[in-house]
Curated annotation (Swiss-Prot):
Protein induction: The probable operon is induced by urea.
Any single biological process term in GO: urea catabolic process
Source species: Escherichia coli
CDD domains reported for this sequence: UreG (cd05540)
Recorded GO CC terms: cytoplasm
Binding site for GTP: 14-21
Annotated family: Belongs to the SIMIBI class G3E GTPase family. UreG subfamily.
Higher taxonomy: Bacteria, Pseudomonadati, Pseudomonadota, Gammaproteobacteria, Enterobacterales
Pfam families: cobW
Protein name listed in UniProt: Urease accessory protein UreG
HAMAP family in the record: UreG
Function: Facilitates the functional incorporation of the urease nickel metallocenter. This process requires GTP hydrolysis, probably effectuated by UreG.
Amino acid sequence: MQEYNQPLRIGVGGPVGSGKTALLEVLCKAMRDTYQIAVVTNDIYTQEDAKILTRAEALDADRIIGVETGGCPHTAIREDASMNLAAVEELAIRHKNLDIVFVESGGDNLSATFSPELADLTIYVIDVAEGEKIPRKGGPGITHSDLLVINKIDLAPYVGASLEVMEADTARMRPVKPYVFTNLKKKVGLETIIEFIIDKGMLGR
C-alpha cells in the first residue's frame, strides 16, 4: 500500500480555445514556489496540452501527465473517470507531498461537468471571443462550476462584445457563485483566481 497525501483536485473545463492551458501555465508559474503542484491534461488522440505546458516550463515534466481519452472527452471526466483518477494517483505517488493537482478536461461544450469523485473544485473557462451571449446560454459549466473565468477581455472591442452585458448575464446565471473577468496574457484577474483556490481549497500559505 503506497502512502501519499491526498491533494486538492481542481477540474479546469471549458470550450476549445477558451484558455484552459494558458490558465494552467500562469497558475503553475505563480503558485509553484509556494505549493507542490501537478497537472493532468486530457486530449482525445494526443498529449498536446501536456507538451505545451512542458515546453512552457510551467512545471517539471514528471509533474505533468497527458491522458489520451479517445472517443468522447466528457466521459473521461464524468461517467468513467478511471484514467484520470489513475493519473492523479500516479502523480501523488511520485510526489508524496502534493498540494494541488489540476485536471484539465479536453475541449468541451457547455454541458460537460466533472465527476465529484475526480474534482474537489471546478473552474470553468469561457472567452469573450465566443460572443457576449455565452453566459446567458447557461449549461452546467456556466451555472454550477465553483468559479467561472471569462477570459480574453482584451478582445471585446474587436468582436463587438459588451463586458457590461456579459457581467449582467453572468450575475443573473450565477447569483451566489463567484466569477472573474481575465486577460491571462497580462495576468489581469489572476490574483483573484489564486485567492479563490487558496480560500476554497483551504490551503495555508
